[in-house]
């Protein structure tokens, strides 16, 4: 992480218990990010927090450190039962819950506290077996948590710490009734440490906070700009005929280390995956129709750089925490201005440079004025040479499984690529040496 995203505040100087400090030290966490430096002193005084912070600011570590420290310094509730967790973390998506659980497991190493995760889509009985053994910190999506609560597998009567992550997304996805259902089955707000984090502290989010929290302190780490200066933005105006060829051509020219391609519909995402797969790219598809086990496998492959490109819808990508994304391609301009910010925010994180490429086609160009008004700047326009667009092969059938082998380095004619022409660690030339960009 770049030092520009850290403060002078050291975790070692905070009044944290030794078990938490040891875990932080072993995982290389020395200095706090701004949201950690502002929120942890408040939380360590056992005061509630309503925090405004974007994804990638370190908020997950902030609330996990506070949660573990609180449980380790607070007596266990008298007569606590095996099915009663002491802390609960609610997340809007399975992928976000999984990421939080991974981070929590690292912090729990020396604490003696057990972490459990529950989410819909798979593993109902396996998750239940873990809960039956008892967990201290429960992390999950609200729907699956409610299922277990209603069956008596989980009882929330001993909750001492609550985290509601990405509260604004909870509203977007219609989960607020679920959240209120769970809050109403916990001890009163004054009997627990309450933490809420959201990209925006809208009136509805603040109302939720004040309804179920104990006079929370508002902590805001709002970026001065909607989009990071680390992200180079550009926009093309392709014809519908050129649009797919342009995407292929730019990917071949940029040869991104790790890229996400966004489209507005599942149908379009499937078409893009089929086309990129046919061209030999290592590409994964992430939509709401992809089974959960396959989703997790695709995310693991993308995170481990076994896949280079991920094609996704906005809903499927919400809550994903993937580092080192070099490029974001907006094949369709989103209808929601905030989605544009969320999309391109996948790159340029933690001080790294990123590239965002958007297409303003005939169908979605009308979305551009609202987006530029929202981000308060114009997106630089880049033209392209139609004659330089590469030919693309017919798409594979949608039902075909993603290619599991190495990246296909063949040229357009299907012959092997010359050994000296592919990219290596740095300074690697593009697949074709004709540039398509014309400033």
Swiss-Prot record:
This is ATP-dependent RNA helicase RhlB. HAMAP family: DEAD_helicase_RhlB. The gene is rhlB. Component of the RNA degradosome, which is a multiprotein complex involved in RNA processing and mRNA degradation. ATP binds at residues 53-60. SUPFAM superfamilies: P-loop containing nucleoside triphosphate hydrolases. Residues 394-439 are annotated as: Disordered. It comes from the Bacteria. CDD domains: DEADc, SF2_C_DEAD. A motif (Q motif) lies at residues 9-37. Residues 243-390 form the Helicase C-terminal domain. One of its GO terms (molecular function) is ATP hydrolysis activity. It is an enzyme of class 3 (hydrolase). It is found in: Cytoplasm. Gene3D superfamilies: P-loop containing nucleotide triphosphate hydrolases (3.40.50.300). SMART domains: DEXDc, HELICc. One of its GO terms (biological process) is RNA catabolic process. Residues 429-439 have a biased composition (Basic residues). DEAD-box RNA helicase involved in RNA degradation. Has RNA-dependent ATPase activity and unwinds double-stranded RNA. Residues 40-219 form the Helicase ATP-binding domain. Its EC number is 3.6.4.13. Belongs to the DEAD box helicase family. RhlB subfamily. One of its GO terms (cellular component) is cytosol. It catalyses: ATP + H2O = ADP + phosphate + H(+).
């Amino acid at each position: 992480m770049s030092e520009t995203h850290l403060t002078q505040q050291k975790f070692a100087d905070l009044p944290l218990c030794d078990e938490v400090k040891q875990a932080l030290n072993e995982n290389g966490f020395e200095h706090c990010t701004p949201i950690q430096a502002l929120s942890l002193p408040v939380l360590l005084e056992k005061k509630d927090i309503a925090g405004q912070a974007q994804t990638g600011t370190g908020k997950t570590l902030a609330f996990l450190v506070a949660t573990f420290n609180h449980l380790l310094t607070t007596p266990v509730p008298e007569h606590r039962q095996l099915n009663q967790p002491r802390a609960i973390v609610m997340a809007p998506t399975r992928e976000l819950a999984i990421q939080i659980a991974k981070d929590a497991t690292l912090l729990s190493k020396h604490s003696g506290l057990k972490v459990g995760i529950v989410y819909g889509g798979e593993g109902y009985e396996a998750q239940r077996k873990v809960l039956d053994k008892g967990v201290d910190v429960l992390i999950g999506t609200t729907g699956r948590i409610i299922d277990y609560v209603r069956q008596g597998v989980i009882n929330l009567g001993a909750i001492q710490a609550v985290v509601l992550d990405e509260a604004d997304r909870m509203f977007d996805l219609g989960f607020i009734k679920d959240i209120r259902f769970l809050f109403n089955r916990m001890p009163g707000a004054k009997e627990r440490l309450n933490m809420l984090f959201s990209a925006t502290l809208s009136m509805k989010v603040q109302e939720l906070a004040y309804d179920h929290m104990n006079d929370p302190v508002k902590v805001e780490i709002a970026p001065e700009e909607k989009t990071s200066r680390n992200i180079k933005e550009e926009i093309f105006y392709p014809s519908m005929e050129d649009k797919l060829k342009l995407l292929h051509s730019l990917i071949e020219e940029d040869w991104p280390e790790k890229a996400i391609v966004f489209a507005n519909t599942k149908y379009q995402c499937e078409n893009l995956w089929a086309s990129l797969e046919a061209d030999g790219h290592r590409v994964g598809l992430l939509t709401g129709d992809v089974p959960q086990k396959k989703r997790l496998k695709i995310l693991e492959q993308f995170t481990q750089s076994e896949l280079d490109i991920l094609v996704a819808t906005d809903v499927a990508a919400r809550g994903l925490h993937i580092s080192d994304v070099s490029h974001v391609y907006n094949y369709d301009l989103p209808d929601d201005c905030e989605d544009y910010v969320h999309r391109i925010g996948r790159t340029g994180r933690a001080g790294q440079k990123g590239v965002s490429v958007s297409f303003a086609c005939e169908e979605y160009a009308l979305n551009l004025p609202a987006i530029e008004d929202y981000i308060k700047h114009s997106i630089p326009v880049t033209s392209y040479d139609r004659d330089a667009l590469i030919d693309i092969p017919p798409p594979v059938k949608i039902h075909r499984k993603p290619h599991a082998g190495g990246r296909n380095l063949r040229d357009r004619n299907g012959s092997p690529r010359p050994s000296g022409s592919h990219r290596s660690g740095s300074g690697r030339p593009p697949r074709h040496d004709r540039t398509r960009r014309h400033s």
